[in-house]
């Protein structure tokens, strides 16, 4: 049985699947063949996850805010990255997240 202590910490993505069989091909293609990801799980019950296209180029422009980056570059960055956070629970070996932001 998985315990809370087993999952608290920082985890790197090693493989990615999909929970949407009707749209599996598009879902898996969104982040490419080598996606990168990070999951942070706190003992206080908070989590944060980020996934992006592996090897994607950095956003161009002024690194302070990138507001001067061309629209196409900003759209590519937006389309190849997702991050979310919220509360998590572990019940009967099932890890569940509640998206708050």
Locations of the language-model features?
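Lipid interaction determinants
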Residues: 1-101
